[in-house]
Amino acid sequence: MNRLLIVASTSYAGMGPYVSGIVNTFLPNDDVYYFFHDYDDLFFRKNVKEELHSRSTFYKLANSIWNKLYDLIFGHWVYEKDILDLCHEKRIELIHFINGCGSCSFNRKLESMGIKVLGTVHDLYPHEVKKAPHKMLRHRVSVRRLQAAIWECHNLLTNSKSQYVELQKLFPDKNLFYHEFPSLVSKDVK
């Protein structure tokens, strides 16, 4: 198995339980490292099992209007250099963007360093949303960037059988993977 870095860029809208549910299946001796974008609630720090913390980077970034504006204008994460440094330090061979695909420019940079990139397709066709105009603008820009990254990324994974079939039609030359959706039913829900 390649030395793997799993990057989780958000814990919102069910993504936190999705990511922590997957990550918590790994063992500390697995050749896997983790980079979590944590917000003020520290979701990942609280929900990723303690024994994986030594292999984890928890990057706390406030969910502020300024950080959202930065992302909207520049189209990349402020912590990309931190991820690159981690890849170099840990000799990462494969990076899995578990919440999406990373930006096109960042993926190209990683691939130029010999690091394979695996993106996750959650919504091939994004849901319609009704929000305030400034939030709609941010949503549309984010969706366009994500769709561009999906088209450019050579390796894609999805948890949806129907999306997997659609991806096979759209991208017959890409490496496509299907993995069953992990259960979000926790012991608290039971």
Q: Which functions belong to the PLM regions below?
A:
Residues 1-5:
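Extreme N-terminal starter segment of soluble prokaryotic enzymes
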Residues 6-21, 97-100:
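A short, glycine/small-residue-rich beta-strand->loop->alpha-helix junction that serves as a flexible
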Residues 8-13, 24-74, 163:
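N-terminal strand-loop element at the rim of the active site
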Residues 76-81, 95-115, 121, 125-126:
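An aromatic- and histidine-rich active-site surface loop
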Residues 81-85, 105, 109-112, 125, ...:
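Membrane-proximal helix-turn-helix segments that form the acceptor-binding/catalytic region
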Residues 101-104, 119-136, 154-155, 185:
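A short, histidine- and acid-enriched strand-loop-helix "catalytic/donor-clamping" loop
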Residues 151-190:
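Donor nucleotide-sugar binding/catalytic pocket of nucleotide-sugar-dependent glycosyltransferases
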